[in-house]
């Protein structure tokens, strides 16, 4: 009798386990996609892909690269596309990035959209011109205390077909980087010592992707050049240092860097209007690209001025290049303003924050600032101050173009 009860108990237990397994398998079949699905793109291109991933990564695996400065985290909202069919309902993580009208039209963040069934999507046509390269670090010196000029050499015979003001994405692998190993030139080490920057360590467990504007212009072939500022934690905080910028600061000539691009929307308008460029910090990069493109490649006759703000002369770079451009082009003037000139600078030029300098020394007496086009890139506080000043002068928002790298 006891043996029968044991046998019965074992049988019932086995039946329960098999039943649970069956339920799990049925649920998995319902909830987890498997097999292949088809993605129709713009009604012209078709991909057959495995189901189960996110749309952004699935497209990238098939050499269709949407911009994603946050690397698929759902925060930058650059990987937008229109999902005509498939993809399921919009997720809560996407809702804040779209208006109700856009949501009805099918706009989605591709990094949040699951690939579970056949889909039809629309993406910008320029996406099909985006490529991927493994580049080699040519040089990576400091050009300011906390800014590196990273120059990457493309593979032989390759070029980036981009417009001035465009950007690419850099990919950095998992790493452990110690700031004490950085190669910082002697003239910039004082502030690194003062703020004890050497104590930081960057530890990254997953691949990180970030977007950076290019400092070169289209006729500077074979390379891509960037101005990248180290993203150190605010004083007194326990926040980790910037993942990508820490890795970039540790790069040495000969190191390999994966690059995707080009992308962009911070492009010059094709008009004859006066162009006023305003920059600060690492916002120099797209300013240089635009100004060199206008004067060196396009031979533009438009009236162009550039207003750049730096803390001291040590933080100003490319000054000789702009001096040369100004000497060669009567339609171009550039102005450097220092907010905190040091005694050794012996500075007799413009001083103050760049939005005040621009207003007091130019726009205050300009006959029609509302007819100018303003292109800017710099720290968020600078951008906000300049935009307020311009709108107070009656400049329409469509004539204020911003490369908002600072969030």
Swiss-Prot record:
Signal peptide: none annotated. InterPro entries: 2Fe-2S_ferredoxin-like_sf, 2Fe-2S_ferredoxin-type, Beta-grasp_dom_sf, Cbr1-like_FAD-bd_dom, FAD-bd_FR_type, FNR_nucleotide-bd, NqrF, OxRdtase_FAD/NAD-bd. The chain crosses the membrane at residues 6-26. GO terms for biological process: sodium ion transport. It is found in: Cell inner membrane. The keyword Protease does not apply. Its cofactor is [2Fe-2S] cluster; FAD. It comes from the Bacteria. It catalyses: a ubiquinone + n Na(+)(in) + NADH + H(+) = a ubiquinol + n Na(+)(out) + NAD(+). Pfam families: FAD_binding_6, Fer2, NAD_binding_1. It is an enzyme of class 7 (translocase). Binds 1 [2Fe-2S] cluster. Its EC number is 7.2.1.1. Residues 35-127 form the 2Fe-2S ferredoxin-type domain. Keywords: 2Fe-2S, Cell inner membrane, Cell membrane, FAD, Flavoprotein, Ion transport, Iron, Iron-sulfur, Membrane, Metal-binding, NAD, Sodium, Sodium transport, Translocase, Transmembrane, Transmembrane helix, Transport, Ubiquinone. Residues 130-269 form the FAD-binding FR-type domain. Residues 272-389 are annotated as: Catalytic. One of its GO terms (cellular component) is plasma membrane. Composed of six subunits; NqrA, NqrB, NqrC, NqrD, NqrE and NqrF. PANTHER family: NA(+)-TRANSLOCATING NADH-QUINONE REDUCTASE SUBUNIT, NAD(P)H-FLAVIN REDUCTASE. Belongs to the NqrF family. NQR complex catalyzes the reduction of ubiquinone-1 to ubiquinol by two successive reactions, coupled with the transport of Na(+) ions from the cytoplasm to the periplasm. The first step is catalyzed by NqrF, which accepts electrons from NADH and reduces ubiquinone-1 to ubisemiquinone by a one-electron transfer pathway. This is Na(+)-translocating NADH-quinone reductase subunit F. It comes from Pseudomonas aeruginosa (strain ATCC 15692 / DSM 22644 / CIP 104116 / JCM 14847 / LMG 12228 / 1C / PRS 101 / PAO1). The lineage of its organism: Bacteria, Pseudomonadati, Pseudomonadota, Gammaproteobacteria, Pseudomonadales.
